[in-house]
Regions:
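Charged substrate- and nucleic-acid-binding regions of tRNA-handling and nucleotidyl-transfer enzymes
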Residues: 1-75
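Short coil/turn segments at secondary-structure boundaries
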Residues: 23-26, 41-45, 198-203, 440-442, ...
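Short beta-strand-to-turn element immediately C-terminal to the catalytic PLP-Schiff-base lysine
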Residues: 143-146, 167-168, 391-392
């Protein structure tokens, strides 16, 4: 019969995550159990009490848990091992007002979710962008400022640091027609889509030299997956595409007005970010108990281990998502034998520490929203057959310096499969001169809102600098489950 043992998972449930400390706790706990000094339940109860208040255990000379208590005290002095207590919160009784752009384009479900979000006790301000639609917790297109020491994993999004990246080449736009097969081949050779997608050869792996990959066990355990997926794209609405960029006079310093060949990509932090989001959203919902309608808006406190771990992980996922795009763009640029004259990129699923117009420091969550501070460049795509836009933020304080992250869904994926037909989609692509590789009916242009109406609704948020017309589009194969 197998002897009873205290597992590492049981110790982690108490909040023990530091590798060295975990080993010490396991050695002491299982030693006491093996020699029948204490029963398992008694050992775990003592360990939980020790973590809550290590001093009495440290002062007890010759005590069984003396060394462990000193480990905890040492970690606390370093600002670690501060557990977030399990707490129950009520929503504010009054619903704060929040500005909405393009109200006529937004479904009632998204509005209801935003109303719930601004009722959180940690909410400071909110805003809803014209591409908004219902999501989990915060609606996609929702912007929420909370107290600066709180962060909501589900308000960042499941695909942490989902982002856009645009490379502009000093090559005439008509090349997209005259060299179509060559450009199509570059996408096939240098992009890889899907949940299990990996790459064999890498362009730049320097990100993996960062010590941050050793900060927490969660990150360490995901490093190999992240490395394997470097330079890949996700599923759903993620894409890499060639198109024509029509640039206005004086829009970008050093680049004359004209029509340029450009490469645009949309994806995030892949399985690395997805696993982080799943792990920490569950912890947040365990630690922060909210009414049912708000449960996905559970937060973590940044002055606790759990909050610090998520903050570190989220920022690393941001760097990783950027590296993914750079890997794709650099490989294609090398094969094309042209360096881009400019590369522009932005997150639209992330949280930033910022200041409101009155000077209040807050945590700004943008879930499917583009940063649009004064002078900040961003990219707002349409769909596979409608234009995207290179924009410059106007710094509108009411929008919390934000704009839409795209056109936004007009219908759900299931509705698209039920109501659209392949002939209609094919005719649209022919009419717009689109070459499409991959994708399915749920990503059809008709499944999205009118990007021109969305842009018109946010003229006071961003200035349009250039229009990007997609022409050669690659997305995940139809068999792939959407990640976005």
């Amino acid at each position: 019969m197998e002897k009873e043992k205290i597992s590492n998972n049981e110790l982690k449930a108490l909040g023990i995550n530091e590798v060295d400390v975990l080993e010490n706790f396991s050695r002491v706990a299982n030693g006491l159990l093996k020699h029948n000094v204490m029963q398992k339940a008694e050992i775990l109860a003592n360990l939980e009490a020790l973590i809550e208040d290590p001093v009495p255990y440290a002062l007890k000379k010759g005590g069984k848990f003396n060394n462990l208590a000193n480990d905890v005290i040492a970690l606390r002095k370093k600002g670690k091992f501060v557990k977030q207590e399990r707490s129950t919160f009520k929503l504010k009784t009054e619903i704060a007002e929040f500005p909405v752009w393009g109200l006529e384009h937004i479904e009632t479900g998204a509005l209801a979710q935003m109303r719930t979000a601004v009722q959180l006790p940690v909410a400071v301000a909110g805003a809803l962008m014209p591409d908004a639609h219902q999501g989990y917790g915060l609606p996609i297109g929702g912007v929420l400022a909370t107290t600066v020491n709180t962060i909501i994993p589900f308000a960042v999004g499941v695909d942490i640091a989902c982002r856009m990246c645009l490379s502009i080449f000093d090559i005439p736009a008509e090349t997209v027609d005259s060299k179509k097969e060559m450009l199509k081949g570059l996408l096939l050779d240098h992009t890889n889509f899907g949940m299990g997608g990996t790459t064999r050869t890498k362009f730049d792996t320097s990100l993996f030299d960062k010590s941050t990959w050793n900060e927490t066990k969660v990150i360490r355990n995901l490093k190999d997956k992240a490395y394997a997926q470097l330079g890949t794209s996700g599923t759903g609405n993620h894409f890499v595409e060639w198109g024509e960029l029509c640039l206005a006079e004086g829009a970008l310093p050093g680049i004359p007005a004209g029509n340029y060949l450009a490469l645009l990509s949309h994806s995030g932090s892949r399985g690395f970010g997805g696993n982080l989001a799943d792990h920490y959203s569950k912890i947040a919902m365990t630690k922060t108990k909210l009414p049912a309608e708000a449960k996905h808006l559970a937060w973590l406190d940044l002055d606790t281990d759990e909050g610090q771990e998520y903050w570190i992980a989220m920022n690393l996922a941001g760097e990783y998502a950027s590296a993914n795009h750079h890997e794709i763009h650099n490989k294609i640029a090398r094969a094309l034998n042209f360096e881009p004259v400019m590369r522009i990129e932005n997150h639209h699923n992330f949280a930033w520490k910022e200041r409101l117009s009155d000077g209040t420091e807050v945590m700004v969550h943008r879930k499917g929203a583009t940063p649009a501070g004064e002078g900040v460049l961003g990219i707002i795509p349409g769909s596979m057959s409608t234009p995207g836009f290179l924009v410059r933020g106007k710094g509108n304080a009411a929008s919390i310096n934000s704009a839409s992250h795209g056109a936004g869904r007009l219908m759900s994926r299931s509705a698209a499969f039920k109501t659209l037909n392949k002939a209609l989609i094919a005719a649209n692509l022919v009419d717009k001169r689109i070459t499409l590789m991959g994708s399915d009916m749920d990503e059809a242009p008709m499944a999205y809102k009118d990007i021109h109406a969305v842009m018109a609704a946010q003229e006071n948020l961003v200035e349009v600098l250039a229009k990007f017309e997609p022409r050669i589009v690659r997305m995940a194969d139809p068999k792939e489950r959407p990640e976005d």
